[in-house]
C-alpha cells in the first residue's frame, strides 16, 4: 500500500507550520492512521533527545507525541544549531557531524540531502502517511539553489504541498500571492491549496478576500483556522512571552535572563504557565529585578552568554540575590556558568580559551567533543525524594568539590549536578526537570512557595493537542483534503 504524504510550507517563519503539522498528525492518529511527522532540515537551539540516542528539533518531538510515537532521528534528519551569527553545528541523524559557516554548508547540502532521503525512505516504508513540515519560506530566492528544506525536497520526492499564512500579522493575501508568484511552474502546480492561520473576528468579513484569492491564484482555500488562546505547546524558536490567562495571586516571583544563545527555553514553560508563579524573561537592557528565584537556562554558547550576563549586570545581581537569601537554579549551560571556570580548549562553542564563571559553585567545566545525549529519570535530592524525568544534551564535563551533594539521583545510581552547602543553589544538567509534577512542586517548595497546587504539564500538553486537533478538524475542508490524506 503506497504511503500518503503532504507537506506544509509557510509564507514566513512562525506562520503556523509546526502547529498545523501537529494538528494533522493528531487528527490522523485519532482516525486510526499510522502517521509520522517529518522535517527534512530544521534550524533551532531547542532540541529533544530521541529513543535512538540522537537529537531532533522540539517541534518534531511534539509532532511525534501527537502521533503517539516516541521521538526518532528520522523525523528530523538534519538539525542546524547556530553557535554564532555565522556558524552552526550540523547534526545528521541525531549526531554532530561538523561545524560549518553558511557558505560551507551550502556546499555540504548534497550530503545532507542524502541523509534526508535515507530517513524519508524508511518512514514511507513504515507508515501509512507522513506529514512534512517545511522551513521558513519556499520563496527565499537566495536559498533556492540546492534547497533541501522546502520545494527542493518536495520536488525530489514528489510530495504535494499546502501553504499556511498567519493573518494575525497582517498582509495575508500579499504573503500568499507573493509566495506563489515566486515559485517555478512545477512548484506552483505542486501547491494544492492555502490555509489561513490565527483568524479572529467575523469570518463573513473575510469571505470576499477568500473568493478573490481563489480566483487570483486558482488554488482553493482549505481552511481558516481560529486564533487559539492558551495552548501549552512547545515553542521552538522565539521565547514565549505572551501573558498567560487564569493566573491566581502569585506566591513566588521568578525571573530568568534571555541571553542571546539561550537553548531549550521551554524548560521554563512550567514556571511561566504555573497559575501561582509570577514568571518573567528579562531581556537585554532590562535591569535584573528582585525575585524569589532566579533561573539560568541552557545556552548553546556558554562563554559568550556568560560575557553577556556580566555586561547586563547579572553577575552582581545574582550575588546580591544570594546574599539576601534568594534561591538560584542553573540548568545545563546555566549550571556550567555557576562554576569557577569554563574551559573550551577545542573551540567547540567559539574561540578556544577559558572564561571565569560566576563562582557560585566550587566546580569547573571543560567542554569536550563527545556530546552527552540521553533520556533520564530518577529523584531529586530534596525532601521526599520527588520523582523526575528529563534528558541530557551537553558537551561539558563538570568536576570539583562543589559536587559533594548531587541535585539529582538518576535511575542508574549516578548523581548529577549539585546543591550548594547553604541550600540556596540547585544545579543540574537535566533538561525538562520542571516538567514532572512532583519535581516541579518540590522545587517550588524549595524556592519558598508553600502549599502550591500540583500541576501536570504533560497531561496539559496532551489535552491541548486534542483541543488544537478539534479546532483544526472543524475548520479544514476535508472534502478537498480527501485526495491528499488517508482516513
UniProtKB/Swiss-Prot annotation:
Gene3D superfamilies: 3.40.50.880, P-loop containing nucleotide triphosphate hydrolases. Keywords: Cobalamin biosynthesis, Glutamine amidotransferase. Residues 251-439 form the GATase cobBQ-type domain. GO terms for molecular function: ABC-type vitamin B12 transporter activity; catalytic activity. GO terms for biological process: cobalamin biosynthetic process. The active site is at residues 332, 431. Pathway: Cofactor biosynthesis; adenosylcobalamin biosynthesis. The keyword Ribonucleoprotein does not apply. The keyword Nucleotide-binding does not apply. InterPro entries: Class_I_gatase-like, CobQ/CobB/MinD/ParA_Nub-bd_dom, CobQ_GATase1, CobQ_N, CobQ_synth, GATase_3, P-loop_NTPase. Catalyzes amidations at positions B, D, E, and G on adenosylcobyrinic A,C-diamide. NH(2) groups are provided by glutamine, and one molecule of ATP is hydrogenolyzed for each amidation. NCBIfam families: cobQ, PRK00784.1. Belongs to the CobB/CobQ family. CobQ subfamily. This is Cobyric acid synthase. It comes from Dechloromonas aromatica (strain RCB).
